[in-house]
C-alpha cells in the first residue's frame, strides 16, 4: 500500500509531526517501515500520536524482530485468541493505518493482476490496525510495529473477487479477505473506545 505524504496525514487526522522529516517507506511492503496513528501513550488526556514502525507486528514473546511467519495482516475474528494479537487487542492497542491506496491480487484471468483501490471521494483510507512495542532484551532497542486487520469478504460484491481461489474450498466458502476501513467519524472510537465499542466498527 502507499502511505500518504506527511502533510496530508497531519491535515487529515489532526496529528502533529514528532519529526520534521518523513521517516517511512514511500511504498509499503510487509516488514517495511510505515506510519500509524494511535492514542498518545504519554498524554493524561486523549490525544492522537503519529508513529513509524514495522508493518508486521512483533509479539511480546518474539526472540528477534524478524519473525519466521507473517504478521502484517491479522484476521479480526481471531484477535481475542491468537497469541500474537490477544494482548494488544485486550489492552486496546488499536491504531489507524493511513493509506492513499492499497493493492489486491485478482486472479480472474488465471494469473495475478494487481488491482489498486482508492476512495472515490478522493479522501485517504483510515485502515484498522493493532500496534505493539517490543524491546530487544539483548540490545535494549525499542521496536514499534503494527498489523493490518482483515475481515471476511465472501459476500462483498467487489472484494470477494480478490485473491487466488482455493481449489479445495467451495465457491461460497473461499474466506476471501478485505482490509477494514474506519470512517472519519469513528476514528476516535476506534482509537480510544472499549473493546466492545471497537468491535462494532
Q: What spans do the regions from the language model cover?
A:
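Short linear sequence motif anchored by a di-proline
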Residues: 1-201
Amino acid at each position: 500500500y502507499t502511505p500518504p505524504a506527511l502533510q496530508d496525514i497531519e491535515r487529515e487526522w489532526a496529528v502533529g509531526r514528532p519529526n520534521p522529516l518523513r521517516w517511512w517507506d514511500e511504498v509499503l511492503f510487509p516488514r517495511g517501515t510505515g506510519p500509524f496513528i494511535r492514542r498518545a501513550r504519554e498524554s493524561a488526556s486523549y490525544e492522537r500520536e503519529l508513529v513509524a514502525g514495522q508493518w508486521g507486528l512483533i509479539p511480546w514473546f518474539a526472540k528477534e524482530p524478524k519473525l519466521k511467519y507473517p504478521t502484517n495482516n491479522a484476521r479480526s475474528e481471531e484477535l481475542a485468541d491468537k497469541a500474537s494479537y490477544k494482548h494488544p487487542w485486550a489492552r486496546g492497542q488499536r491504531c489507524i493505518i493511513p493509506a492513499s491506496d492499497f493493492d489486491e491480487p485478482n486472479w480472474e484471468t488465471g494469473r495475478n493482476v494487481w488491482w489498486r483501490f482508492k476512495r472515490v471521494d478522493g479522501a485517504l483510507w483510515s485502515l484498522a490496525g493493532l500496534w505493539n512495542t517490543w524491546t530487544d532484551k539483548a540490545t535494549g532497542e525499542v521496536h514499534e510495529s503494527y498489523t493490518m486487520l482483515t475481515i471476511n469478504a465472501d459476500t462483498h460484491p467487489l472484494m470477494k473477487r480478490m485473491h487466488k481461489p482455493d481449489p479445495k474450498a467451495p465457491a461460497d466458502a473461499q474466506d476471501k479477505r478485505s482490509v477494514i476501513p474506519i470512517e472519519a467519524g469513528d476514528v476516535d472510537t476506534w482509537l480510544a473506545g472499549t473493546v466492545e465499542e471497537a468491535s462494532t466498527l
